[in-house]
Amino acid sequence: MKVLVVGSGGREHAICRAVAKSSRVDKIYCAPGNAGIAALAECVPIGAMEFDKLVSFAKDNAIDFTIIGMDDPLVGGIVDEFEKAGLKCFGPRKNAAILEGSKAFSKDLMKKYNIPTAAYENFTDAKEALKYLETAKFPIVLKADGLALGKGVLICNTLEEAKEGVRTIMEDKKFGTAGNTMVVEEFMTGREVSVLSFVDGKTIKIMSSAQDHKRAGDGDTGLNTGGMGNFSPSPFYTDEVDDFCKKYIYQATVDAMAKEGRPFTGVIFFGLMLTEDGPKVLEYNARFGDPEAQVVLPRMKNDIIDVMEACVDGTLDTIDLQFEDNACVCVVLASDGYPVKYEKGFKITGFEKFDGKDDYYCYHAGTKFDADGNIVTNGGRVLGITATGATLKEARAKAYEATEWVQFDNKYMRHDIGKAIDEA
């Protein structure tokens, strides 16, 4: 069969790599792809938001199955467009992708269906938000309602910071229309864990847990980013936590969406906070995380096409989802200055060192070919250096070893990815 993957980051590289392992797939296309994906798929110069062009391409090239990696096209309704054209597409429809597309919607859903989450209020008026904050308890969390590349969450320790946050989100519109509505949420403490799942509208199958590192700097300092590294599984995601989440969060979310007339098909990413009062939902994403996909998919034993087709066909209950009993760590190599301002176009060397090593992998995020055919930096997050091992500590040591194999000017990384492993 022919498969089209839509997106251009490390997550899509991980998806393409999993698809390439499927015995059912003869040909992979990726739109728009990147320099690393080009080794596995034919990259097509169509942007992820160019729905009409993507649908035409899929029809003209007799694509059997399309996989959407990114949040923007899902929230924008790309799956609806593919379905209208009679094409099979993996991901939630627009009316279900709102689970990620609107934080206010997801908070209201959790409240209505008693899914554990932080106390909150939604605001569409900056003055009302400021009035509410006058009497609020600090620290407090402000969230832009819409998509903001994982950067629309502000933790405010004082009223002054909160006022500045309201200005940033609602008045200056730093995150554009994403800030038309703002969620004000109680600040929760505990460990953050990500859990990925496959969903077919009624059945949910949990993949594995992972742990992200969102801040740009060592010691969780600096600005929020799309993610500077990850490890899977999380040692803090115990059987007890799993039992609680299965009982009160996972199926409850799928059932809630179905009851609302918004059946969810695709991947639900649960961002959880393990608090003293038990696990609570921080956020939902309607797709694989990045770099969560890079640490979870290499551990999956199943043929990804079998699983994704079962989601689309509503037969996920027949799939026995299996994962290797191992660990995986990803360290992101970024451009110095990310997530604010950085230079691009630097030549990257050292890829050949990964050749023939099954337990090491270099996922490309912000890369492209220059006019001379060299691979150069083309984004804030450039590469995801990933390694598997029998234990988290082994995988971490191997991933950091491999970060030295690749060189480019302005290379930046965190040196404490997986530090929490030592505290487990």
Question: What do these predicted ranges mean?
Answer:
Residues 246-268, 285-359, 370:
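Active-site "cap" helix and flanking loop/linker of ATP-utilizing ligase/carboxylase catalytic domains
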Residues 90-152:
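A conserved helix-loop-beta module that forms one wall/lid of the active-site cleft
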